[in-house]
Amino acid sequence: MPFEIVFDGAKDFADLIATASNLIDEAAFKITEEGISMRAMDPSRVVLIDLNLPESIFSKYEVEEEETVGINMDHFKKILKRGKNKDTLILRKGDENFLEITFEGTAKRTFRLPLIEVEELELDLPELPFTAKVVVLGEVLKEAVKDASLVSDALKFIARENEFIMKAEGETNEVEIKLTLEDEGLLDLEVEEETKSAYGISYLADMIKGIGKADEVIIRFGNEMPLQMEYPIRDEGKLIFLLAPRVED
């Protein structure tokens, strides 16, 4: 069998795939001895998605040889949603062109998902000279995006020495969410210089759908530069989005 991978807590894995699937229809997952990785761009080429899951976060990780598997993300998401919190998730691939997805809990349930041909693009995750790093709770980000969507299609991020502001302005109204390190929702703030940039709300909404209210989200950005949003996964794994800025007139 080319690989057998076991992940304790099926729902956590499902949330991860659901978040990525909001932006991409299909993906090529690279399975190596070191772990699982995936890098893709959304169809509009506005968001880069980078997933890295080292073998150490899995309770069992057996890979015979490096392999790339193409997966329909919507079908994968729908199957994974059938997993319960306490279920163990088992991913297997034999010689046939199927991914076997098994949930072990009160019963053993197995799905077989046909693999597909996916074009592998050479995509680099650029190292950008960000001037602000912000760590917030998922709840803060989710509420800010919901608030901003009422008044505009863009959300401006502003980082200063002692505060982080998210602001949206419409033709007749506006909303501002302000955080300092005294607020529970802002966990860390590092600012080299006052930094401002705006981003499309529809993309932000897709990027944060799968995160929990108590999850930590690491945001890095620069003046009119892409926004890098990172979700740590069980300490060693991570899901990163790189979102192009909304250029203001």
Curated annotation (Swiss-Prot):
Pfam families: PCNA_C, PCNA_N. The lineage of its organism: Archaea, Methanobacteriati, Methanobacteriota, Thermococci, Thermococcales. This is DNA polymerase sliding clamp. SUPFAM superfamilies: DNA clamp. PANTHER family: PROLIFERATING CELL NUCLEAR ANTIGEN. PROSITE patterns: PCNA_1. InterPro entries: DNA_clamp_sf (IPR046938), Pr_cel_nuc_antig (IPR000730), Pr_cel_nuc_antig_C (IPR022649), Pr_cel_nuc_antig_CS (IPR022659), Pr_cel_nuc_antig_N (IPR022648). One of its GO terms (biological process) is regulation of DNA replication. Coiled coil: none annotated. One of its GO terms (molecular function) is DNA binding.
